[in-house]
Amino acid sequence: MTQRSLKINIIEGKDLKGLDSGGVSDCYVKFKCGPISAKTEVIKKSTSPIWNYMINIGNVEENTLLQFECFDWERIGNNRTMGKTQAFVSDLSSGAKRNLMDQWLRLDTKGFIRISYEFTPPYPLETESTNSPNLSVVGNGSSSSSSLMYNPTPVYFKPIFLPTIPSETINNNKSTTCHFLIPGSVYQTRPFVCGEFVNCSLVLNVFEARIVVRSLNLSFSGSITYKGKKQRKLVNDYRDLLLGFTGGVPVPNNNGNNNLTSNKVVLERGKHVFPFQFFIDKTCKSTVNLTDYKVNYYLSFHADIVNQPDISASQEIKVVNLEDTVYKQTISPINAQTSKSPLTGGNISISCKSVKNSFYPGEEIELEVEVNNSSKKKIKNVDIQLNKVEYDGTDVTGTSYQLLTMTKKFYPKIKQNTACKQMVVIELPSTTQCVGLIHSIAETKMIRVEYHLLVNLDIPSCVDLRLKLPITIVQPDPKFETLPNPLTEIGNLPRYVKDWSIKNFHSWVLFKKQCPDVMALNPEFYQYNLSGSDLMQLPTETLYSIFKGAGPRTQELVNDLQSQIFEIKLVRNFLKELQLSNLIDYFEKQTITWDILLQLNYNEIFSITDITIGDAKRIFLKIQQIQSERQKQQEQQEQQVVSNLEAVSLQKSE
């Protein structure tokens, strides 16, 4: 076996515990590997310190243990531990064989430590397909190969910059804001499918002239929680969105280390859109929120800003495994029957049939009910209940919940020596109508969720006849999108473009202009996340990029939108020219565009707001001047046309 030496560089920490006042700590790391121990410098008042501390360990074996412990330095008293973690050299060598030379180590309390490493001589790279995963994060505590999470090679996208934030602040807010942008979620909540990529964006709105950032850390996590305790991590991946500026290649700092976070990046005033991508393994579970059993997935973001307070954002996303949907539903028919003999004699039987036993929320269950009555009873109706039963852990007796009850009457009534076959339609509630209607679950030693229909034949003056029909609830097609009513959306479009919401802009494209290709053929469209106030400030070339999916209709859409924008801007410029900028808001509240402005008389202008007589008169005189100039131009154009016609007729006569 080849003997190899190892160098470790403790680069940085992230999301560490803040033990001092202000939620920060004076952070340093103690390292131990056999007889070798080392300590980094203390970085004060931080939860994301940068150390860049190099340690030459020397020769190591695959089973050599590396120990890291993070401390909060105290001037007086004992230093306080902030968490620890450990990893075997085999964990690092497996990454080196895949050309991965740095890893995040998860502390056993909160936060992470990032290290890089170098083996001498280096390991030969393993041959693997492009889909082969790379080592991303090492687990905490008793680290072993089984606690490692493997994620596909990170893909970084170039950020999009839109200079859309006006010089004046919005709602007197000068702080930088951020939020997640989920594609396809304008009209409804969009779920993500296991085995596919999560393609989203992080939107950073900068209101100051510029901000300076050290890092834009993004994480994607998912876990199973049972009775308040995490049972299993389903996904755990990380990105620094600043790597999008370099295509994912770390930038060497002054010390020669590949560490982008030590290089500050300036972000100008405007909207910065950072597209990102994570992968959900096909073995992950669907999102569930029960009292004792939860499967949750979160996107979390933290921006380390130099000249402003740091900002954070978190959003839960819905994940669906196709095994829990209509794509994997079983086509097992329902066929059950039972009978009884009343004391008064005769027999009553009931049978229920359906072509399948799997249904999704909102679907109609078509149940064929057949009743044969040879007794003296007169049967009028049948009662149907939908029950959900939750089994906790290994319990055999579950807790039952009634989700739906209904009564169906027989027409005509089933009298003695008669039979009736009737199709009963049971309308399952949607998930919005009944939050408790989740898909059927069977998680070993944790929870089991089952459903059944109780069909109760109501027999007068006798014990009712009951059938229990087990059914399976699955989730609907996760990729099916229900669009709203086009007429309603068009009717809700504000008169002013500047008042459009993001939803209004989508509705204008989809329904009013009837051009779905803008979104269908341009996957980047959703990343712009544009409202009316944004559209008012975009240059023409950006509008062409937004509408490029429209193909030959791109020019039409740009012209239509710009004409509406110009109608507003002309009114603003008109008032600014008269030094009446303070009246812009009053005019826009009355939705006065340029074409309407030129038709206003003095009384209408004066009634807009508490405008002074002098200002109203100045506006009215300016309107008259513009109308007069327009009339002169029109007369000149008419005279020019007449002159041209006379010249043509004169040439013909000659």
Swiss-Prot record:
PROSITE patterns: C2. Keywords: Coiled coil. InterPro entries: Arrestin-like_C, Arrestin-like_N, Arrestin_C-like, Arrestin_domain-protein, C2_dom, C2_domain_sf, Ig_E-set, SAM/pointed_sf. One of its GO terms (biological process) is protein transport. Residues 616-647 form a coiled coil. GO terms for molecular function: cAMP-dependent protein kinase regulator activity; identical protein binding; phosphatidylcholine binding; phosphatidylserine binding. SMART domains: Arrestin_C, C2. Pfam families: Arrestin_C (PF02752), Arrestin_N (PF00339), C2 (PF00168). The keyword Coiled coil applies. Residues 1-105 form the C2 domain. One of its GO terms (cellular component) is cytosol. Belongs to the arrestin family. PANTHER family: ARRESTIN DOMAIN CONTAINING PROTEIN (PTHR11188), FI21816P1 (PTHR11188:SF17). This is Arrestin domain-containing protein C. The gene is adcC.
